[in-house]
Every structure is written in structure tokens, then in C-alpha cells.
């Protein structure tokens, strides 16, 4: 399957960037083609590897519309994986990601890294919006699965538990 992962990505140093790289490596092992759309604090801040095919300046709202157009016109993208954490995307509480999703014509899987038990109205609305349009929602804990269903109104049949895990490494 041809997949595009949307989130932060190395050389940015953050947990989701590392998660995105590890997920890509795992998907490649299983025969998938995986491209990356990286979200940065500003364009051209990082020298990304060749798998990064598009860069979003997180606070530049037009980039989200351009990103959706890029995905929609990419014949070699069948599925989008969106790594969601409120601090990744621009606007109040990361609201700009809704612009991209609102234009997206391809199916996407929403991976929830933070599911707040007592969200602000804005945070709740954003996650409701994203989950309500997703083909699947990935939660990393049973508690976040319940919150996604009960509080964020994601359809229970679309929520999957995939524990975070760790990458393989040699113990010395």
C-alpha cells in the first residue's frame, strides 16, 4: 500500500518525529511504500531525508490547503496517517489541521498521541472533527480508547488499540 505519514519527522528531535520514523521503517519491512509530510516550525529549518515529499510550516495556514491539494493529486498515495498531538499543528490548539482534513479526499487513519480527559472546548472540537472523518482511530491505551468513544464521540468500531511500544535496539 502507498502511505503518506503526516507529522513531525527527524532530524527534528521529538517523540512523535521518532515515532513517525519507526512507524515508517516498520511499514517498509512489510512491503508498503511510505512517504512523509513533515510539519516544521518554519520551512527549510531542517534538511529532511528524501522520503519527505512535502513540508508544512506549522503556523503558515496556506500550507495546510497546499498540503491537502498535494495529497489529493498524488496518484501514489492511497492512505494518509495523521499523527495528532495538539502542539504539532498551527493555530489555536492546532486547529489548522482541520483545514487540511476538510479538503482531504483520501482516507486517513488518525493516531492519537494525547487524548485529554478534561479538554477545553477547542481541543474537544478539534479531536471530534478529526475522529469523525477518519477511516480509523488509533489509541495507545485502553483509557484513551474509552475517551475517544465516550467523550470525543468517535465510532467505537473505528477505534483500535495499538500500544506505543519501542523500536528494536541492541542491548550492550
Where are these regions (language model features)?
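Nucleotide-activated donor-dependent transferases that construct or modify glycoconjugates
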Residues: 1-13, 82-86
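N-terminal strand-loop element at the rim of the active site
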Residues: 11-13, 21-77
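Conserved alpha-helical elements of sugar-nucleotide-dependent glycosyltransferases
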Residues: 16-26, 96, 126
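Short beta-strand scaffold positions
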Residues: 18, 139-140, 161
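Short N-terminal targeting/anchoring amphipathic segment
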Residues: 54-58, 69-94, 109-111
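A short, histidine- and acid-enriched strand-loop-helix "catalytic/donor-clamping" loop
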Residues: 85-89, 107-122, 136
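Membrane-proximal helix-turn-helix segments that form the acceptor-binding/catalytic region
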Residues: 99-103, 107, 121-137
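Carbohydrate-associated surface elements
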Residues: 143, 162-165
Amino acid at each position: 500500500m502507498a502511505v503518506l505519514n503526516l507529522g513531525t519527522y527527524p532530524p527534528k528531535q521529538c517523540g512523535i518525529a521518532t515515532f513517525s520514523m519507526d512507524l515508517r521503517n516498520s511499514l517498509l519491512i512489510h512491503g508498503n511504500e511510505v512517504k512523509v509530510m513533515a510539519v516544521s516550525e518554519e520551512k527549510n529549518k531542517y534538511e529532511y531525508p528524501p522520503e519527505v515529499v512535502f513540508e508544512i510550516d506549522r503556523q503558515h495556514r496556506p500550507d495546510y490547503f497546499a498540503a491537502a491539494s498535494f495529497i489529493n493529486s498524488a496518484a501514489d498515495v492511497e492512505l494518509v496517517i495523521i499523527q495528532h498531538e495538539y502542539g504539532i499543528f498551527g493555530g489555536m490548539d492546532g486547529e489548522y489541521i482541520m483545514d487540511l482534513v476538510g479538503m482531504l479526499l483520501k482516507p486517513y487513519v488518525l493516531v492519537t498521541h494525547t487524548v485529554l480527559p478534561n479538554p477545553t472546548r477547542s481541543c474537544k472540537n478539534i479531536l471530534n472533527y478529526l475522529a469523525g472523518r477518519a477511516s480509523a482511530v488509533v489509541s495507545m491505551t485502553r483509557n484513551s480508547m474509552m475517551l475517544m468513544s465516550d467523550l470525543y464521540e468517535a465510532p467505537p468500531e473505528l477505534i483500535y488499540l495499538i500500544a506505543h511500544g519501542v523500536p528494536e535496539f541492541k542491548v550492550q
